[in-house]
A protein has these predicted regions:
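C-terminal extensions of enzymes
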Residues: 76-148
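Glycine-rich phosphate/ribose-binding loops and adjacent secondary-structure elements
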Residues: 1-75
């Protein structure tokens, strides 16, 4: 996929925006930015949120995992989203376990916020010339911490 994207981007004019549809995996977004892509959209944050997967800067978390059963902390302490500022990971796990519709909504909200923060960090790293370092550091931590 990387080779196809790189080839396709080489055919596009530099002065026009470049858009990748359906790209939501953080590694793919970072690769796309490195190739010159400007815009992305994908259902991944909400689809994964509906299924109990939370994106964090330390990797994916499966909120149904028993280790969250009595956790009083939010899904991600550094996140300022409504979910993380009002609900514990243990409560979210409870919502998923009883089939309460609020759980998927709250986790989707967190995931959307994660991707907004992620894209903001990418933009900042591009503007200050540290994108390659940001990408390497992010990938090292995110995929090492993947706990799905």
């Amino acid at each position: 996929r990387h080779k196809v994207s790189a080839f396709t981007f080489s055919l596009l004019p530099d002065e026009k925006p470049r858009y990748m549809m359906g790209i939501g995996e953080p590694r793919d977004i970072l690769d796309g930015v490195e190739m010159g892509c400007d815009m992305f959209d994908c259902v991944l944050p909400t689809r994964n949120g509906r299924n109990g997967c939370a994106f964090t800067y330390r990797g994916r978390l499966n909120i149904r995992n028993s280790r969250f059963s009595s956790m009083k902390d939010p899904v991600e302490a550094e996140c300022g989203c409504y979910t993380c500022t009002h609900f514990s990971a243990g409560y979210l796990r409870h919502l998923f376990n009883i089939g309460e519709g609020l759980g998927p909504v709250l986790l989707s909200l967190h995931n959307i916020t994660f991707f907004m923060r992620f894209m903001e960090d990418i933009r900042n790293s591009v503007m200050n010339g540290s994108f390659k370092d940001f990408k390497q550091h992010f990938l090292q931590i995110f995929y090492k911490g993947n706990q799905q």
